[in-house]
């Protein structure tokens, strides 16, 4: 019997099956499940990994992990690193905002250079709820309470209806390897 995630994923991607995707892969459980689903469904995709140099050896190990997965699965892998702290200092932005600005600019550059149809991220239901709560605490207007859009003309987030627990369970049940980012358990960053 197919898992809920597989059914939802297949249904969402049915209309886009002939597209060429660039998947943002950190090495964490969400993005590794996403990459595995793309692979399982024989979709055309490449992987993009950002090393923000924020966790020293751990960041480098994530980069190597993603690179090795791509080699093992015969997938094109784009990888880059940023001096995130310096960028944030120079642009007077927080780490989360700076890292987001850096990665999305790079993803969009890759999309334009290589002709990808969509940039795909592994945002999930928990991210959607977190965004809604943060925006409501900040006092945003109605536009801020909408949350993360599933699809725009350039971005696609097919896991937005799936919870983090469901993704983690799917990874365990399907022997999908991933890396745990120690900063995820920290309260240092407001996303």
Language-model features: locations:
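ATP-dependent adenylation/nucleotidyltransferase module used to activate substrates
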Residues: 1-135, 165-166, 173
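Catalytic subdomain that performs nucleotidyl-dependent activation
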Residues: 118-122, 127-191
């Amino acid at each position: 019997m197919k898992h809920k995630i597989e059914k939802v994923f297949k249904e969402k991607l049915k209309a886009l099956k002939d597209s060429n995707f660039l998947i943002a892969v950190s090495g964490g459980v969400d993005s590794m499940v996403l990459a595995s689903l793309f692979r399982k469904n024989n979709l055309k995709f490449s992987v993009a990994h950002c090393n923000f140099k924020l966790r020293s050896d751990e960041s480098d190990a994530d980069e190597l992990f993603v690179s090795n997965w791509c080699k093992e699965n015969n997938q094109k892998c784009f990888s880059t690193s940023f001096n995130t702290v310096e960028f944030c200092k120079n642009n007077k932005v927080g780490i989360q905002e700076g890292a987001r600005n850096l990665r999305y600019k790079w993803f969009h550059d890759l999309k334009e250079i290589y002709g990808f149809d969509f940039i795909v991220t592994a945002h999930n239901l928990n991210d959607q709820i977190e965004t809604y709560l943060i925006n409501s605490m900040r006092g945003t207007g109605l536009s801020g309470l909408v949350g993360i859009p599933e699809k725009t003309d350039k971005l696609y987030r097919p896991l937005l209806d799936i919870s983090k627990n469901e993704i983690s369970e799917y990874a365990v049940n399907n022997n999908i390897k991933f890396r745990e980012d120690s900063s995820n358990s920290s309260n240092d960053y407001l996303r």
